[in-house]
Amino acid sequence: METTNSNYFGTEKISRILLKIAPPVMLAQLIQALYNIVDSLFVGKYSESGLTALSIIYPLQLLMIAIAVGTGVGINTAMAHYLGVHDEKKANEYGGIGTPLTLALWVLFAAVCFFFMPAYARMSTDSPEVIKDVIVYGRIVCVFSIGLFTESIWTKILQANEDMKTPMIAQIAGALVNIALDPLFIFGLFGLPKLGIAGAAIATVVGQIVAALIVMKKGFRKSPPLSVYPRDICFIYKLGIPNILMQSAYTFYILGLNLILATFSDQAVTALGLYYKWQSFFFIPLGALQTCIVPVISYNYASGRMDRCKKTLSTSLVGGMGLMFIGTLVFNLIPGQMLRVFTSDPQVIAIGTVGFHFVGISFIPMVTSLIFPVFFQAVGAAVKSSLLTVVRTVVLFVPLGYLFSRLGLNYFWFTFPVTEVITTLVGVFFYRRFMAQQK
């Protein structure tokens, strides 16, 4: 077991901390993003219906990740808090609850998804071919998601102990296995059976299991006595629910946007799905910052170093905006080329080109609207974190998407920049009130 350097988060220069712990996370997320792109590329070459099915399944995959990663973030934050007050025994107690808790979550999620999948597919599209692909792909990636659940928990345990290298290696290995298996299983190369969309799903879960096995040795902790489970689980979810809400809200707003776009065409749904594939690539810096600032802020807040909490927030915002400006340029300069990587459907390309222009504009304000909830989560302001997430995803995204869509498909894409600007303003208001209460 690796133990944390208890003074590092509290004494080292903030920019140096982030430069040390963020690159491994970024590299791992880069490989994950490349996997998402390559996975969709192979499926798109196999069939257009399969590509649409991936767009429809995407919200469910986000929900699965939200439950797993959000629980892991709760454990990570609890461990970082107790490490901040030099109580390593208590920190490891929370780590020990992680494995039994995540296995229970996996069983529950797998059972619900297996029985719910046909209804979800029929709700999302009228195409029989797409419905079939959704059911096949969705059932495999949900029922066999044990690798995703356990890897998420063990990764967060290691990150709480400043071990960013092992999770990076695990995620890279899992993604590379996935990428290697995709063409073999989808197209039936080297004498293997041609499995199509099912092959893509199998490659996904195999890669997840490989990643989980790599982090298991260092991430697994001995379970504490059952008597502490109720109290500790309540504390884990007090800290983790904001992240779960934030991530699962993505599920419901993307599902809502998919249903709105489905009133226009399946091609519109596919265009939105391709945006999220590319978004995962360009949001690597932001995702890494979200992951890395939580233990830093949580540690310093527990130690009474509010000045370092503020510095961590400002450093992540400035760095995130600078990096996301590159994404804004790319989405506005070469949207057609990005779409043609996956599809030759002229309708998808035409719809997506317009959409990419408007969505790219939203990247800069999106930095603040996504970093603020993480900050509030790390300092234990769960209500503010949750409210900000609800405002963005429930109050704004889907209602605005519906209203703009009534004006026409092109107007629908205004939803993204308008939502991010309003959320940023609300986040600034919450932050100022929080800081006033600290004086």
What do these predicted ranges mean?
Residues M1-A22, M79-I146, L192-I241, I297-S362, ...:
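Short alpha-helical transmembrane segments in multi-pass integral membrane proteins
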Residues F9-L41, K45-Y46, L62-G74, A78, ...:
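N-terminal transmembrane alpha-helices
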Residues L51-F115, L148-E162, T166-P167, A271-L329, ...:
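Small-residue-rich hydrophobic transmembrane alpha-helices
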Residues G72, V141-Q159, P167-A175, A200-L213, ...:
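Short runs within selected transmembrane alpha-helices of multi-pass transporters and secretion channels
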Residues C113, K156, D182, I186, ...:
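Structural signal for membrane-spanning alpha-helices in multi-pass inner-membrane proteins
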Residues S248-Y250, L396-Y402:
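Hydrophobic alpha-helical transmembrane segments in multi-pass integral membrane proteins
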